[in-house]
């Protein structure tokens, strides 16, 4: 309920901090906060940073003994297209949660490529970590390891349902509904 939230100095609920120190560079572009717990009862929060075709997930763990949140761990990065092997920036739409002893993330990718056949996002992507904190031990669906942050979404790609559609015209394939 709303009475559990702390108002900011303007009487609203937008905060640029998790630990009482305003940090504009880390909090200004965050949206869609989600919370989950692991088997140890630790509380995690993840958010999307950035926009549709250039967004990233980052997450933080709450430490009850110090009443503070950890620094953000970046699952992926914004501006991935700046990497030499990545052609386009991309954002992700999906969910991060802890299920059956693993931190897991499933998503669809939305590329900044405006000339591909997809309208909005495409693909099925999945990764998991055996580390309850999610800080290390990430693997794709085939069990191949990778380090965070993830730059190349194709490394965690499970499948592309859009491949079953025979077209190369832009914005013709729509596979978004009810994904998450």
Specify the residue positions occupied by each region the protein language model found.
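Extracellular, repeat-based ectodomains that mediate carbohydrate processing or recognition
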Residues: 1-180
């Amino acid at each position: 309920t709303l009475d559990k939230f702390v108002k900011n100095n303007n009487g609203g609920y937008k905060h640029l901090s998790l630990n009482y120190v305003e940090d504009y560079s880390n909090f200004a572009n965050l949206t869609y906060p989600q919370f989950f717990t692991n088997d140890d009862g630790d509380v995690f929060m993840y958010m999307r940073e950035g926009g549709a075709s250039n967004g990233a997930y980052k997450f933080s763990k709450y430490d009850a003994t110090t009443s503070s949140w950890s620094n953000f761990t970046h699952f992926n990065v914004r501006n991935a297209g700046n990497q030499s092997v990545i052609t386009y920036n991309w954002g992700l739409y999906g969910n991060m949660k802890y299920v059956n002893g693993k931190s897991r993330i499933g998503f669809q990718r939305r590329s900044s490529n405006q000339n591909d056949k997809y309208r909005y996002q495409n693909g099925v992507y999945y990764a998991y970590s055996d580390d309850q904190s999610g800080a290390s031990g990430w693997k794709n669906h085939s069990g191949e390891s990778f380090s965070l942050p993830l730059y190349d979404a194709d490394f965690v790609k499970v499948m592309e349902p859009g491949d079953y559609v025979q077209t190369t015209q832009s914005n013709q394939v729509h596979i978004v509904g009810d994904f998450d």
